[in-house]
Regions:
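Post-transcriptional modification and biogenesis factors for structured RNAs
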Residues: 1-239
Length: 239
């Protein structure tokens, strides 16, 4: 189950266009975080056309913390980081679609929030840090930022393409957010026992492991195997 999330959208027309694009590609769940405009006004309805039902059923919440309800939170950004900036180390929409198709297939039990930032400033660094992984659309280095609805269209198109293929994984349970939190708590215990020449290296390790686990889209069985391995390491540390 995939939900399109818009953070503090400012333009009713953009929201309406997003709703129309969602219906074009068979996505129906729209979540608005602290919208800065009336998303049900005439401009929004006019742009939505036959997707007004998506606008009417849109869920509105106050802040980003609501996204903790989802198993995976996938953020989008036009601002790229270097190899050393783990938080802004992205994948492309086609790679995301490929991974989701191969790993999750038609599994509808795994909840995914696909998050698009503010029209003017995008997602904050803190919000990006709260995402499990980041997606970016390749564009000209001279001007990377796309219009909100255009960015949504590109990403959802890539997500839609694999849906026409046969899926074989609908019966396989995947790791939940709670499972990932348990894994990270164990990794934190292991990291706490290690000495690093530079203090920031420990936090970098934590972020790398968090991103690595999220990008892998582990099945529940794979996650349990990982947890068992981490428990053995902790047992060795404790003697």
């Amino acid at each position: 189950m995939l939900c399109v999330v818009l953070v503090e959208p400012e333009t009713p027309g953009n929201i309406g266009s997003v709703a129309r694009i969602m219906k074009n590609f068979c996505f129906r769940q729209l979540l608005l975080i602290n919208p800065k405009c009336n998303y049900l006004d005439g401009e929004a309805y006019g742009r939505a056309m036959h997707a007004r039902d998506i606008l009417k059923k849109a869920v509105v919440v106050k802040d980003f913390s609501y996204l903790k309800k989802f198993d995976y939170v996938i953020g989008t950004t036009a601002a790229l980081g270097s190899d050393y900036n783990v938080l802004r180390s992205p994948i492309t929409p086609d790679k995301l679609a490929q991974q989701l198709s191969q790993r999750l297939g038609s599994n509808r039990k795994t909840s995914i929030a696909l998050v698009f930032g503010r029209e003017g400033t995008g997602l904050t660094s803190k919000e990006i840090g709260n995402c499990d992984l980041i997606v970016t659309i390749p564009a000209s280095k001279k001007y990377r930022a796309l219009n909100l609805s255009h960015a949504v269209a590109i990403v959802l198109y890539e997500m839609f393409k694999p849906s026409k293929s046969v899926k074989l994984t609908s019966h396989i349970p995947f790791a939940s957010r709670h499972d990932k939190e348990i894994a990270m708590s164990m990794i934190n215990v292991i990291l706490a026992s290690m000495d690093f020449a530079i203090g920031s290296k420990k936090e970098t390790q934590r972020m790398v492991w968090s991103r690595l686990i999220s990008k892998s889209f582990l099945t529940r069985r794979e996650m349990y195997a990982l947890l068992g391995f981490l428990r053995k390491i902790i047992k060795m540390i404790n003697g």
